[in-house]
Amino acid sequence: MVSMLLVGRIGKSVGLNGGLRLHLESDFPECLKKGVKVSVAPLNAFFCTSSFKGYTIHSYEHAKNLLFLETIHTPEKAKELTNLGLFMSEAESKKLCVLKDGEFFYCDLVGLSVVEENETLGKVVEIQRISQIDYFMVETARSLVEKGLAKIFLIPYRDFYIKEILLQDKKITTNNAKTLLENS
């Protein structure tokens, strides 16, 4: 099964030529180039590939958050896509997006263990953006839950909390994250 990544949420139709307002969920708008293959589906369709319908990008105006797809030329056709998600395959995203040193794809961070002072606090199950700050949603290790700590807690993606991300070791080392867990 192809892994799909949410690029944005499609808003209302704009204009008479099938334009779509795009609420970007990605840090890489440069991936939205003419000719790039994308898919549209309900936002909860991550695991139901039959829900995805393929399209090709005609253009994207980042300053206006305006997306045009090659086969959508009327407001009526555009309205059919309102409130759906715009997705791109993980492979296509990684091919088109050039990461700087220290940057990561969300999909590579989900599933990593969170470790502080050689103690596993849990694993990253999701990443959320709240007020321009990314947060790791961490499912707490069972042994810590049994001690009465929260089942889920959030760690801001800030240097104060995140010491190092080691993809090869499948772990994120932290400072001060256990305090967040204890106070959750």
UniProtKB/Swiss-Prot annotation:
A Gene Ontology term for the protein's cellular component: ribosome
Keywords annotated in UniProt: Chaperone, Cytoplasm, Ribosome biogenesis, rRNA processing
InterPro entries (UniProt xref): PRC-brl_dom, PRC_barrel-like_sf, RimM, RimM_N, RimM_N_sf, Transl_B-barrel_sf
Example of a GO MF term: ribosome binding
Segments crossing the lipid bilayer: none
Pfam families for this protein: PRC, RimM
KW rRNA processing (keyword) present: yes
Gene Ontology BP annotations: ribosomal small subunit biogenesis; rRNA processing
Subcellular location: Cytoplasm
Domain PRC barrel: start-end pairs: 101-180
Quaternary structure and partners: Binds ribosomal protein uS19.
Protein family per UniProt: Belongs to the RimM family.
Annotated NCBIfam families: 16S_RimM
Domain notes: The PRC barrel domain binds ribosomal protein uS19.
Protein purpose: An accessory protein needed during the final step in the assembly of 30S ribosomal subunit, possibly for assembly of the head region. Essential for efficient processing of 16S rRNA. May be needed both before and after RbfA during the maturation of 16S rRNA. It has affinity for free ribosomal 30S subunits but not for 70S ribosomes.
Protein name listed in UniProt: Ribosome maturation factor RimM
Taxonomic source organism: Helicobacter pylori (strain Shi470)
Lineage, uppermost ranks: Bacteria, Pseudomonadati, Campylobacterota, Epsilonproteobacteria, Campylobacterales
